[in-house]
Amino acid sequence: MNRPYAKLTITKKGERAARSGHPWVYGEEVTHVEGTYQTGDIVDVYSDKDRYLGTGFANDISKIRVRIVSRNANDRFDEAFWQRRVKYALDYRKTVMGDKDFACCRLIFGDADDMPGLTVDRYNDVLVAQTLCYGMDQVKPVIFKALVDELAAMGVTIRGIYERNDVKVRKLDGMEEYKGWYEANFLPQPGSVLTTIDENGILYDVDVENGQKTGFFLDQKYNRLAVAKIAVGKHVLDCFTHTGAFALNAAKGGAASVTAVDISQEAVDMTNENIRRNGLEAIVTAKQANVFDLLTDLAEHKCHDYDFIILDPPAFTKSGHTVRNAMRGYKEINLKAMKLLPRGGYLATCSCSHFMRDDLFRQMLHDAAKDAGVRLRQIEGRQQSPDHPILWNVPETNYLKFYLFQVV
């Protein structure tokens, strides 16, 4: 087969992963290189039996040598190819999210959309993008133009694309850190970095420049509705509230009172603004505190003011090497929460790290309940919303765990 790309031959272990559908080829799996390439170039991947396995972006700087983007040897990686990818991603979101939720959702989710390292979130008329793969960074002008054009065809006008490339992991792929509005002749002057969204009937201010991740945690959209359903008449403690999304959904669902806690004063200020915007000052109170210290203090004072506790911490581990330490952190907060809740109380608990596998998270909860002397009655076990699709052959796309329990 006469191919225009450099050819990388990989080990049997790498071949098994590639044939199973995993898009990553690690540097130690490459045994032979035929031809030359530069970082960001398209290369072919072959087995040691000379079987074609896929084509993707190469990067000798990264631990991941190749990120496969196609397994069709007939594909041409021109503008039309990426336009098809974008259209496919948008059509999927339009179908699974519906018209209303499509206005505020994740449009592109990296490997789950065969666009490795690329995240694009939509907040009404603003898109927020993050590029963590050198090759995708090179083709982003085509991707961004396709997004604006396809959304326009759906009747959506985009006023700006904000790049949140201010993350250290970009350096691992040989790219600089920065953030700011993407400039292109197909985009108008973007205006403010603040925008307002409506999720589940609740209004939020989103700061795309300074907010965590891309400005808002879209993946918990439907898990918040599960909390709202249980919150009726409850006294709720929402830990790690960020901008107050779980707290506000609980209040909107009929909670008697909600206390929202975060260690960041900036997050508390944003939560207070969202409380006022939704007219929920009589129900929700936001306070700045370290959740670990707060739970300890409540336990020492034998406080039983809350019959519903929500734990949505940041990722305690971003590496497989620190999972054991992370489990101790997760167990500590869950154990304390279980001890604080009365019999018949409710606990919503989450982990957003894919390194914290579901079986490990469940085992941690089992151990915490045992040590707390309680039993857990599971109401729901959920994952991220479907705009963050899970590919079963790419376990890294399955990262969010959400469990809702009654303590009995």
Per-region residue spans from a language model:
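Conserved SAM-binding motif I beta-strand of class I
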Residues: S257-D262
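Conserved class I S-adenosyl-L-methionine
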Residues: G233-H242
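Non-catalytic substrate-recognition/targeting regions of SAM-dependent transferases
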Residues: G110-D121, P141-F216
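Conserved SAM-binding loop of SAM-dependent methyltransferases across substrates and taxa
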Residues: T243-A256
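C-terminal catalytic and target-recognition region of SAM-dependent MTase-like enzymes
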Residues: D305, E332, Y346-V408
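Non-catalytic accessory regions of SAM-dependent methyltransferases
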Residues: M1-N124
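Mobile active-site "lid"/loop adjacent to the S-adenosyl-L-methionine
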Residues: Y306-K336
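S-adenosyl-L-methionine
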Residues: E266-I310
